[in-house]
């Protein structure tokens, strides 16, 4: 899988565009926050959040993606710290982040089991998790995202993962047009998540 992402991000164009995800842009993200972006790819969300005046780190296991993140950050006059790590093995620092972001961060079951408890532990008290992911219904649209059901999310699955850990969660299933580069393009079924520790 790592080779797949390195090949995709080795293309000259930004696979998912250079603009941040619409859900992320619609949030009231403050300034001066320590922010972690998971499976951030080419850095479009990290760069946007850094442009608001935040200290942003992103983790991805594609070196090609992180190189494009650095290039995009330079083009936008901001700094983003990139860490090349496999999220199935990473150990996140506890109570370190004000905000953790996961945009279309889709993982196999064993990675989900590893990473989501760590995300909760890594947030400071009062910290926030923001996510937009493809719903399982996305398979019928064929406009982006994984083509395997087990890599997609169901609302009930996310509720089960997050309810026992977060003090407040809001999960909304929506149908919207996603236009993010050439690989996420068209009508889609997504889940948008806001969770507070």
List where the protein language model places each region:
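A short SAM/SAH-binding and catalytic strip from SAM-dependent methyltransferases
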Residues: 98-113
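A short acidic, Gly/Pro-enriched loop at the edge of an enzyme's catalytic core
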Residues: 88-99
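Conserved class I S-adenosyl-L-methionine
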Residues: 1-30, 137
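A short glycine-rich, Lys/Arg-flanked "PGG" loop and its adjoining helix->strand segment in the class I
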Residues: 113-125
